[in-house]
């Protein structure tokens, strides 16, 4: 009887540990690291938005604050 209780306890502990690890990535904790990896892996260094838009973004400082502009104005923001 004691062996069965111990086995159930160990299995529950393993389940809790696995669930806790998985939950950390779902909350977006690693979002910034993933974005940096994506920026580094892209081959083409182009601006997807019009040149005027990207220049305004750089002047306004949105290259540092906005992921949207950081990805779509890579060349103007100096990320590649």
Curated annotation (Swiss-Prot):
GO terms for molecular function: potassium channel regulator activity; toxin activity. Disulfide bonds join 45-80, 54-73, 63-77. Residues 21-39 form a propeptide. Residues 1-20 form the signal peptide. The keyword tRNA processing does not apply. InterPro entries: ShKT_dom (IPR003582). It is found in: Secreted; Nematocyst. Keywords: Disulfide bond, Ion channel impairing toxin, Nematocyst, Neurotoxin, Potassium channel impairing toxin, Secreted, Signal, Toxin, Voltage-gated potassium channel impairing toxin. SUPFAM superfamilies: Crisp domain-like. GO terms for cellular component: extracellular region; nematocyst. It comes from the Eukaryota. Residues 45-80 form the ShKT domain. Its main location: secreted. Inhibits voltage-gated potassium channels (Kv1/KCNA). This is U-actitoxin-Avd9a. The lineage of its organism: Eukaryota, Metazoa, Cnidaria, Anthozoa, Hexacorallia.
